[in-house]
Amino acid sequence: MKVLVLFCLVSLAAAGPLKDALNKAQVDAFYAEGYIVDGSNAADGDAPYQVSLQRTSHFCGGSIIADNYILTAAHCIQGLSASSLTIRYNTLRHNSGGLTVKASRIIGHEKYDSNTIDNDIALIQTASKMSTGTTNAQAIKLPEQGSDPKASSEVLITGWGTLSSGASSLPTKLQKVTVPIVDRKTCNANYGAVGADITDNMFCAGILNVGGKDACQGDSGGPVAANGVLVGAVSWGYGCAQAKYPGVYTRVGNYISWIKGKGVPV
Protein backbone atom coordinates (compact mmCIF):
# COMPACT_ATOMS: atom_id res chain seq x y z
CA MET A 1 0.00 0.00 0.00
CA LYS A 2 1.32 3.44 -0.89
CA VAL A 3 1.11 6.26 1.63
CA LEU A 4 0.37 9.95 1.30
CA VAL A 5 2.72 12.01 3.43
CA LEU A 6 3.50 15.51 4.43
CA PHE A 7 7.27 15.43 4.51
CA CYS A 8 7.49 16.38 8.20
CA LEU A 9 5.15 13.62 9.33
CA VAL A 10 5.09 10.00 10.36
CA SER A 11 3.84 7.92 7.42
CA LEU A 12 0.10 7.97 6.81
CA ALA A 13 -1.93 4.96 5.75
CA ALA A 14 -3.86 6.30 2.78
CA ALA A 15 -6.16 4.40 0.49
CA GLY A 16 -8.38 7.42 -0.17
CA PRO A 17 -7.93 11.00 -1.35
CA LEU A 18 -5.47 13.53 0.01
CA LYS A 19 -8.04 15.29 2.17
CA ASP A 20 -8.88 12.13 4.14
CA ALA A 21 -5.23 11.26 4.69
CA LEU A 22 -4.35 14.73 5.88
CA ASN A 23 -6.95 14.65 8.60
CA LYS A 24 -4.80 11.95 10.19
CA ALA A 25 -1.66 13.88 9.28
CA GLN A 26 -2.75 16.74 11.49
CA VAL A 27 -2.91 14.35 14.45
CA ASP A 28 0.52 12.89 13.75
CA ALA A 29 2.17 16.22 12.90
CA PHE A 30 5.70 17.06 14.00
CA TYR A 31 6.85 13.61 15.09
CA ALA A 32 8.71 12.49 11.99
CA GLU A 33 12.39 12.26 11.46
CA GLY A 34 14.10 11.94 8.23
CA TYR A 35 16.63 11.55 5.18
CA ILE A 36 16.68 12.36 1.45
CA VAL A 37 15.92 9.13 -0.47
CA ASP A 38 18.95 7.84 -2.45
CA GLY A 39 20.98 10.97 -1.77
CA SER A 40 24.57 11.49 -0.70
CA ASN A 41 26.34 13.35 2.07
CA ALA A 42 26.44 17.10 1.51
CA ALA A 43 29.83 18.79 1.71
CA ASP A 44 30.70 22.09 3.35
CA GLY A 45 29.23 24.91 1.27
CA ASP A 46 26.75 22.76 -0.68
CA ALA A 47 23.70 24.24 1.06
CA PRO A 48 24.79 26.99 3.47
CA TYR A 49 21.21 28.25 3.67
CA GLN A 50 19.88 24.98 5.15
CA VAL A 51 18.63 25.03 8.75
CA SER A 52 17.08 22.52 11.13
CA LEU A 53 13.88 23.48 12.94
CA GLN A 54 13.83 21.93 16.40
CA ARG A 55 11.74 21.64 19.52
CA THR A 56 13.50 18.90 21.46
CA SER A 57 14.97 17.56 18.20
CA HIS A 58 14.85 18.06 14.43
CA PHE A 59 11.39 17.95 12.84
CA CYS A 60 11.56 20.12 9.70
CA GLY A 61 13.97 22.00 7.50
CA GLY A 62 14.09 25.62 6.42
CA SER A 63 16.12 28.13 4.43
CA ILE A 64 17.92 31.30 5.49
CA ILE A 65 16.57 34.12 3.29
CA ALA A 66 17.83 37.04 5.41
CA ASP A 67 19.98 37.27 8.52
CA ASN A 68 16.87 37.17 10.71
CA TYR A 69 14.34 35.25 8.58
CA ILE A 70 13.81 31.58 7.73
CA LEU A 71 11.48 30.31 5.00
CA THR A 72 9.76 26.98 5.65
CA ALA A 73 6.50 25.11 5.01
CA ALA A 74 3.27 26.23 6.66
CA HIS A 75 2.43 22.67 7.71
CA CYS A 76 5.66 22.55 9.72
CA ILE A 77 4.69 25.38 12.04
CA GLN A 78 0.93 24.99 12.24
CA GLY A 79 -0.16 25.14 15.88
CA LEU A 80 3.31 25.95 17.22
CA SER A 81 4.39 28.96 19.24
CA ALA A 82 7.55 30.86 18.38
CA SER A 83 8.87 30.32 21.91
CA SER A 84 8.91 26.54 21.33
CA LEU A 85 11.24 26.75 18.31
CA THR A 86 15.02 26.67 18.05
CA ILE A 87 16.86 26.96 14.74
CA ARG A 88 20.21 25.21 14.28
CA TYR A 89 22.36 26.47 11.41
CA ASN A 90 25.95 26.71 10.17
CA THR A 91 26.42 22.94 10.39
CA LEU A 92 25.95 19.77 8.33
CA ARG A 93 24.59 17.97 11.40
CA HIS A 94 21.13 18.56 12.79
CA ASN A 95 22.06 17.49 16.32
CA SER A 96 25.46 19.06 16.94
CA GLY A 97 27.81 21.83 15.92
CA GLY A 98 27.07 25.14 14.33
CA LEU A 99 24.97 27.76 16.06
CA THR A 100 21.46 27.99 17.43
CA VAL A 101 19.00 30.86 17.63
CA LYS A 102 15.50 31.15 19.06
CA ALA A 103 12.45 32.15 17.06
CA SER A 104 10.58 35.35 17.94
CA ARG A 105 7.72 35.28 15.42
CA ILE A 106 5.99 32.77 13.15
CA ILE A 107 4.18 33.96 10.02
CA GLY A 108 2.12 31.27 8.33
CA HIS A 109 0.44 32.04 5.02
CA GLU A 110 -3.07 33.29 5.66
CA LYS A 111 -4.52 31.11 2.90
CA TYR A 112 -2.75 27.88 3.78
CA ASP A 113 -5.21 25.02 3.27
CA SER A 114 -4.46 21.94 5.35
CA ASN A 115 -6.78 19.83 3.20
CA THR A 116 -5.17 20.59 -0.17
CA ILE A 117 -1.76 21.76 1.16
CA ASP A 118 -2.08 24.86 -1.03
CA ASN A 119 -0.08 27.94 0.02
CA ASP A 120 2.26 25.75 2.07
CA ILE A 121 4.70 28.48 3.03
CA ALA A 122 5.69 30.24 6.24
CA LEU A 123 8.31 32.59 7.63
CA ILE A 124 10.11 32.45 10.96
CA GLN A 125 11.70 35.59 12.35
CA THR A 126 14.64 34.92 14.65
CA ALA A 127 15.07 36.56 18.04
CA SER A 128 18.53 37.77 17.05
CA LYS A 129 20.40 38.04 13.79
CA MET A 130 22.12 34.91 12.55
CA SER A 131 25.85 35.02 11.91
CA THR A 132 25.96 34.56 8.15
CA GLY A 133 28.68 34.99 5.54
CA THR A 134 30.54 31.76 6.36
CA THR A 135 30.97 28.57 4.35
CA ASN A 136 27.93 26.92 5.95
CA ALA A 137 25.78 29.94 6.82
CA GLN A 138 24.54 32.15 3.99
CA ALA A 139 21.20 33.52 2.88
CA ILE A 140 19.92 32.11 -0.40
CA LYS A 141 18.64 34.31 -3.21
CA LEU A 142 14.92 34.37 -3.97
CA PRO A 143 13.47 34.11 -7.49
CA GLU A 144 11.52 36.81 -9.29
CA GLN A 145 7.82 37.12 -8.53
CA GLY A 146 5.84 34.74 -10.76
CA SER A 147 8.83 32.65 -11.81
CA ASP A 148 8.26 28.94 -12.33
CA PRO A 149 10.93 26.20 -12.57
CA LYS A 150 11.09 24.85 -16.12
CA ALA A 151 10.18 21.23 -16.81
CA SER A 152 13.27 18.98 -17.12
CA SER A 153 15.54 21.51 -15.39
CA GLU A 154 17.33 20.12 -12.34
CA VAL A 155 16.96 21.17 -8.72
CA LEU A 156 19.02 20.42 -5.63
CA ILE A 157 17.09 19.20 -2.58
CA THR A 158 18.74 18.93 0.83
CA GLY A 159 17.61 17.77 4.25
CA TRP A 160 17.80 15.33 7.13
CA GLY A 161 14.68 13.37 6.09
CA THR A 162 14.04 9.58 6.08
CA LEU A 163 15.65 7.04 3.78
CA SER A 164 12.23 5.64 2.94
CA SER A 165 8.60 6.29 3.76
CA GLY A 166 7.92 5.35 7.36
CA ALA A 167 11.57 4.93 8.34
CA SER A 168 12.62 6.36 11.69
CA SER A 169 16.38 6.93 11.87
CA LEU A 170 18.12 10.18 10.98
CA PRO A 171 21.29 10.45 8.92
CA THR A 172 24.41 11.74 10.63
CA LYS A 173 25.05 14.37 7.97
CA LEU A 174 22.94 16.56 5.73
CA GLN A 175 21.83 14.70 2.60
CA LYS A 176 21.49 16.05 -0.93
CA VAL A 177 19.90 14.84 -4.15
CA THR A 178 19.43 16.33 -7.62
CA VAL A 179 16.20 15.62 -9.51
CA PRO A 180 14.47 17.04 -12.61
CA ILE A 181 11.32 19.16 -12.63
CA VAL A 182 8.25 17.26 -13.87
CA ASP A 183 5.76 19.00 -16.12
CA ARG A 184 2.85 20.25 -13.97
CA LYS A 185 0.18 18.92 -16.32
CA THR A 186 1.68 15.42 -16.28
CA CYS A 187 2.14 15.47 -12.52
CA ASN A 188 -1.43 16.67 -12.00
CA ALA A 189 -2.77 13.86 -14.17
CA ASN A 190 -0.86 11.27 -12.13
CA TYR A 191 -1.90 12.68 -8.77
CA GLY A 192 -5.50 12.94 -9.93
CA ALA A 193 -5.64 9.15 -9.63
CA VAL A 194 -5.31 9.48 -5.84
CA GLY A 195 -7.63 12.46 -5.49
CA ALA A 196 -4.93 15.11 -5.15
CA ASP A 197 -4.52 18.36 -7.07
CA ILE A 198 -1.26 20.04 -8.08
CA THR A 199 -2.14 23.74 -7.95
CA ASP A 200 -0.36 26.63 -9.61
CA ASN A 201 1.34 27.25 -6.26
CA MET A 202 3.11 23.88 -6.42
CA PHE A 203 5.54 22.08 -8.69
CA CYS A 204 6.74 18.49 -8.92
CA ALA A 205 10.25 17.09 -9.12
CA GLY A 206 11.53 13.53 -9.39
CA ILE A 207 12.43 10.83 -11.89
CA LEU A 208 9.06 10.09 -13.47
CA ASN A 209 8.31 6.40 -14.18
CA VAL A 210 11.51 5.43 -12.39
CA GLY A 211 11.41 6.97 -8.92
CA GLY A 212 14.10 6.20 -6.37
CA LYS A 213 15.16 9.78 -5.57
CA ASP A 214 13.04 12.14 -3.49
CA ALA A 215 12.56 14.10 -0.31
CA CYS A 216 10.88 12.22 2.53
CA GLN A 217 9.58 12.70 6.08
CA GLY A 218 11.71 15.17 8.04
CA ASP A 219 12.69 17.13 4.92
CA SER A 220 9.55 19.30 4.99
CA GLY A 221 10.09 23.03 4.69
CA GLY A 222 13.63 22.53 3.47
CA PRO A 223 15.20 24.11 0.39
CA VAL A 224 14.78 23.25 -3.27
CA ALA A 225 17.42 25.23 -5.15
CA ALA A 226 18.27 25.86 -8.79
CA ASN A 227 21.53 27.61 -9.63
CA GLY A 228 21.74 29.11 -6.15
CA VAL A 229 18.15 30.38 -6.12
CA LEU A 230 15.44 29.12 -3.75
CA VAL A 231 12.74 27.95 -6.16
CA GLY A 232 10.86 25.66 -3.77
CA ALA A 233 10.21 24.34 -0.28
CA VAL A 234 9.68 20.64 0.45
CA SER A 235 5.95 20.07 0.94
CA TRP A 236 4.25 16.66 0.39
CA GLY A 237 4.01 13.54 -1.73
CA TYR A 238 2.36 10.16 -2.26
CA GLY A 239 4.82 8.03 -0.35
CA CYS A 240 8.47 8.82 -1.06
CA ALA A 241 10.36 8.24 -4.33
CA GLN A 242 7.40 6.57 -6.06
CA ALA A 243 7.78 6.15 -9.84
CA LYS A 244 4.45 7.78 -10.79
CA TYR A 245 4.29 10.28 -7.94
CA PRO A 246 7.21 12.71 -7.76
CA GLY A 247 7.65 14.95 -4.73
CA VAL A 248 5.49 18.07 -4.55
CA TYR A 249 7.05 21.40 -3.61
CA THR A 250 5.85 24.90 -2.79
CA ARG A 251 6.51 27.26 -5.70
CA VAL A 252 8.39 30.07 -3.96
CA GLY A 253 8.21 32.32 -7.04
CA ASN A 254 4.50 32.84 -6.41
CA TYR A 255 5.15 34.33 -2.97
CA ILE A 256 7.83 36.98 -3.39
CA SER A 257 5.36 39.85 -3.01
CA TRP A 258 3.90 38.14 0.06
CA ILE A 259 7.37 37.70 1.57
CA LYS A 260 8.31 41.33 0.98
CA GLY A 261 4.94 42.40 2.38
CA LYS A 262 5.85 40.76 5.69
CA GLY A 263 8.87 43.02 6.05
CA VAL A 264 11.58 40.59 5.01
CA PRO A 265 14.58 42.62 3.74
CA VAL A 266 15.14 40.83 0.43
UniProtKB/Swiss-Prot annotation:
Transmembrane segments: none annotated. The keyword Thylakoid does not apply. It comes from the Eukaryota. Residues 36-260 form the Peptidase S1 domain. Keywords: Allergen, Disulfide bond, Hydrolase, Protease, Secreted, Serine protease, Signal, Zymogen. It catalyses: Preferential cleavage: Arg-|-Xaa, Lys-|-Xaa. The record marks 214 as: Required for specificity. The active site is at 75 (charge relay system), 120 (charge relay system), 220 (charge relay system). GO terms for cellular component: extracellular region. Residues 1-15 form the signal peptide. Its main location: secreted. One of its GO terms (biological process) is proteolysis. Residues 16-35 form a propeptide. Disulfide bonds join 60-76, 187-204, 216-240. It is found in: Secreted. It is an enzyme of class 3 (hydrolase). InterPro entries: Peptidase_S1 (IPR050430), Peptidase_S1_PA (IPR009003), Peptidase_S1_PA_chymotrypsin (IPR043504), Peptidase_S1A (IPR001314), Trypsin_dom (IPR001254), TRYPSIN_HIS (IPR018114), TRYPSIN_SER (IPR033116). Its EC number is 3.4.21.4. One of its GO terms (molecular function) is serine-type endopeptidase activity. Belongs to the peptidase S1 family. This is Trypsin Blo t 3.
